[in-house]
Amino acid sequence: FRVDAPVAAGAAAPKPPTELLDYGLFGTLHLSRPAGEASGTVLFFSDRDGWNERQDRLAGALAGEGAFVVGIDLPTYLRKLAGLSGKCSYPAGHVEEVAHWIERQEGFATYTYPLVVGDGMGATFAYALVAQAPAGTFAGLVTLGWDGTLRFAKEICAGDAGAMSAADNGAYRVVPVAHLPAAWTPKPFASGARVTGLLADVRVAFDATGALIHPLASPEARADLAATFARWRRNEDAEHVALPDDVADLPITDIPPTKGDAHRIAIIITGDGGWAGLDRGIAAALNADGVRVIGFSTLKFFWHKQTPDAAAQAIARVIAHYGKTYPDARFVLIGYSFGASLVPVVANRLPDAARERVDGGVLISPDDEAVFEIHVGDWFGSTHHAEAMPIGPEMQASKVPLVCVHGADESDSFCLKPQPAHVKVVALPGGHHYNGDYAALGDLIARNLPTRNRPAK
């Protein structure tokens, strides 16, 4: 993360126009649009008193730098969150869903991972939110001020980074995690921001990631926040790695192995959250075992409706590109959840030349059906779609060996149904997320990667 230097004051800006839109748990969303095409999405959480003119002006400054800003009234959401059933709360899922929905509503050409901003109590909430989410869910975090008095009615479910809430007199307070899953720009003393509660609470949270606390003397909060967003966009652009022309239009991430000569290449077809925590955890384990990983984001590829053949053609292009670069490499297709159900569908439709390079497929917690478009709202329960393709017949027809992995707690797993002889079924402790032990999941996959005899030359 970064602690930014102060920015000189600018002229006072008029209150920008804000569009209001109702959305379920979040009540009224406050939308601030850029003049042209958005360069990124910002999810902005208000302070404890709700969305007001201060946040309107800050959102307007962000929009002036090209951000599409979704303003969220924190008190409204916290009231509705407290009324939900369940032992613990998972706000990261709710917020990810609203990000997907609003970008689909706005007609974004592809999904862009949002930057999360919080003001005052919204800063403390935003920290807990990003700490809970799998790595890759949010592009980054900016906190203005801090409010150590934030309390949740229920425990916040632990995420991949561990617990971020602790019991406190019948409620739950935010506690720091050792490693935040996204880049954090803390501005504890930004102009106009509140720091409430013991300063030690703030220091503990910031020290957890090695930050140094010092006051920022920026006299103009809007200019400072706008400049922070602009710097963040520049950093994102600078970190982007250009892909070769023949695969430049595909949503792939290339991760070389930490050892070995890339004689095995795994194409990971992600879950519907895109290149995130579980997929990255598997990639790390495979990398350590000498496997090159190509992550294929279903969130981006299936943002618009595709066909089974189009999906197979995209994977065939990946195989062709890396197969040319590494002529002795063998490939395996690995998918999780949404992506797992696509593995047999894609494998069965690959051109012969591509399929001959594929040793097999691994399905991690597959659904019974494969679908070919991201449907907003599917993140909170299985939904049948008319265009869905049952994968049972695809498994039966597979010309490559398959491994079906499920959590021992997934009593309704597709893997537990009768499977053909060429499908190996493997169980691991936990449910759909495998208790967050992605290293164990990755190690299991590495040990069970399918193999085939090389075709005769």
Model-inferred region functions:
Residues 33, 148-205, 371-430:
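The feature captures the conserved acid-bearing segment of alpha/beta-hydrolase catalytic domains
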Residues 34-67, 71-74, 247-291, 295-299:
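Short, surface-exposed "cap/lid" segments of acyl-processing enzymes
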Residues 73-90, 272-274, 297-313:
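Cap/lid segment of the alpha/beta-hydrolase catalytic domain
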Residues 84-109, 113-114, 128, 305-326, ...:
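Alpha/beta-hydrolase active-site loop
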Residues 88, 216-238, 309-310, 436-448:
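Post-His helix in hydrolase/transferase enzymes
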